[in-house]
Amino acid sequence: MSGVRLDKIVKSYGSTVAVNDVSLDIREGEFLTLLGPSGCGKTTTLRLISGFIQPTSGAIHFGNKDVTGIAPQHRQIGMVFQDYALFPHLTVSENIGFGLVERRYDKAAIKKRVDELLALIKLEEAADRYPSEISGGQAQRVAVARAVAHPPSVLLMDEPLGALDLKLRETMQTELRRIQQELGITAVYVTHDQAEAMNMSDRIVVMNAGIIEQIGSPKGI
């Protein structure tokens, strides 16, 4: 786990500036939300942090390490999207443990970590079910567990609750916040939903037209 620092980040696509001179300190262990309308630069900022795209100028640090130009697989990030992207042919347990298998953890360590995460997301009874046999909210919890199975420096979430109905979305806001707090992990969350940002965040970054308009606590925004 580490904090994240963006220093004078610019991302341009030809003559279009998607992110314009953004500087931001994300504190270690905090839940920070990037809030704004479509096209404001919030998802581009998240993708810059992840390493999926590179800045036109500026630098990105995880803790004291400059990760600018480093590929996503070498940044030790966890990613959760609106599309859960669970493997349909793998059980819940196998989905959670997939990254650990890829990293050649031994079987005992994989089982121990998967069991810990099943308890954390309260899905022990669904361990042997397939994605088609669980609900959307359960699938999203599995996606989060998979993202943090190998402890990441930072957990990045791109509108992960957007496909859920309102009641389930509100429940999952509480669940995601609980999971993040229990793990003590640094989390960056993207949404256009102001109520969602207010309910979940330690701090909110309001973005518009590629710039940061305001940063503050939910009470201060």
Indicate residue ranges for each PLM-predicted region:
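Pre-Walker A (P-loop) beta-loop-beta motif of ABC nucleotide-binding domains
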Residues: 22-33, 87
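The feature captures the beta-strand-to-loop junction immediately N-terminal to the Walker
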Residues: 35-37
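ABC ATPase nucleotide-binding domain helices that frame the ATP-binding cleft
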Residues: 43-46, 142
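Helix-to-loop junction immediately C-terminal to a conserved catalytic motif
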Residues: 50
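Conserved ABC transporter NBD signature motif
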Residues: 58-66
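ABC ATPase nucleotide-binding domains
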Residues: 75-78, 83-221
